[in-house]
């Protein structure tokens, strides 16, 4: 075991997806897993195999899509969960099962209704069963932050003897202070020694997840569990980008500790998560917020122009955020287009290149100046493919009196051309009602967001919708177009197609 390396365990695909409205389909999960491999994380928690057939399928597909990263499935300390986890990761080159049980008095008494001895027995049995599927087994003491240290040591001893290779101590409800997390981790590091890796998993309910994770590292934890953009249920999880950049930027404090993160993939990873989930980092978010490297104060601007380090402790280029220069136009050829995509980290087959180049030429005809962010959105739209049950052929709309509007749409469905129109309270409402009429499937819009992808009056609009259909969880749809209304229709159609694909 390398005592200087910090193992980065990313749980965006599992814990991050539990953030309200952040559900991802299988294609999106696979694309994100591929990006996390490029980012250089060591372990990805690809999902909770027993939760649903969709989760199981996504984990299986991720195992086939990555080759360098360790793929992990979460499982409760229940035999059927562990069996599902083991079967879902069996094709992975590197695999892990992560099993857990609550150890705090309040959880054992009210949730599990088990005695401490019974909890230990369940932990032992689950770890031994998990070891029949793979050698690498992680055990978590759920709600360790509110557990008694003496009991944590007792169950950890039993877990290691049963075969656990990593011991995770989560602050499940984000309750602990850095000094308290440091004490707990320090005690377990001394207790466990070299017998297992000690891991931290912090939540941000009191805004201290990153500070707590840093404290855990300083106390001896050698695995950190985190998510891109700090995505997660309630107030979120430890933000991966913040911790790894702290280790890099403050090497004077952390050396010789290090991670294997490819820092130049941080920004792209952040944008991909934001695009897929529709959850944008707040503008002043550390590292990846749009204002993270912006300076408005005249004094600050003057200082940065004279020497960047006067007010910048790291460079935007360090995280892969290059100057958003004009890169291509309608006269650009396929070779220049391919070279630019390669520089942005995309390697396409000839068929993929031909398909996306055709879309690029259409965009270039509508938009004079093409920026890096335009290409990133175009590629995300191309790589995260959803079967198209419905496709937009044409859209027209008109404003009526007193805020009312009408929309007319022509859609293609199974080689059949369908047309209809509807009135609504504004054009957006009219578009959605028309799609509902044509498809025969009614959706309930829960959220609607629109933003400009890049700069300029002809910037593409990126529309994200969150829709509830019959017997579905929230479905996310994205639309990209220089026409905001067309982007709106594409986003709703995208959500509809995802819903139909999930049902099938």
Curated annotation (Swiss-Prot):
Entry-linked NCBIfam families: leuA_bact (TIGR00973), PRK00915.1-3 (NF002086)
The cross-references to InterPro entries, in alphabetical order and at most eight, read:
2-IPM_HCS-like, 2-isopropylmalate_synth_dimer, AIPM/Hcit_synth_CS, Aldolase_TIM, LeuA/HCS_post-cat, LeuA_allosteric_dom_sf, LeuA_bact_synth, PYR_CT
Q: Which gene encodes it?
A: leuA
Q: Gene Ontology terms, cellular component aspect?
A: cytoplasm
Q: Which organism is it from?
A: Campylobacter hominis (strain ATCC BAA-381 / DSM 21671 / CCUG 45161 / LMG 19568 / NCTC 13146 / CH001A)
Protein name per UniProt = 2-isopropylmalate synthase
- Pfam families referenced in this protein's UniProt entry, alphabetically: HCS_D2, HMGL-like, LeuA_dimer
Question: So where does Mn(2+) get bound?
Answer: 15, 201, 203, 237
Question: Key word Lipid biosynthesis present in the record?
Answer: no
